[in-house]
Curated annotation (Swiss-Prot):
Keywords: Stress response. This is Heat shock protein hsp9. GO terms for cellular component: cytoplasm; cytosol; nucleus; plasma membrane. One of its GO terms (molecular function) is lipid binding.
Length: 68
């Protein structure tokens, strides 16, 4: 379960599974904006203030981001 005001894990999964070719311009813009907000929220919220699942997800995402 994601923390309040963060993108749910289900929503993130759906966005990744849906091909861009089947998304509207508005959907793509919304995903981009909410994704950027989620990344900022992840960076500015300390791991101690996150739920266990959100902390694990953010750590995994940071690991992936560092590898790219």
């Amino acid at each position: 379960m994601s923390d309040p005001a963060r993108k749910s894990f289900t929503e993130q999964g759906k966005e990744k599974m849906t091909p861009d070719s089947s998304k509207s311009t508005l959907d793509k813009a919304k995903e981009s904006i909410t994704g950027a907000y989620d990344k900022v929220a992840s960076a500015f919220t300390s791991d101690e203030d996150k739920s266990t699942s959100q902390e694990a997800h953010d750590k995994a995402q940071r690991f992936v981001d560092d590898k790219l």
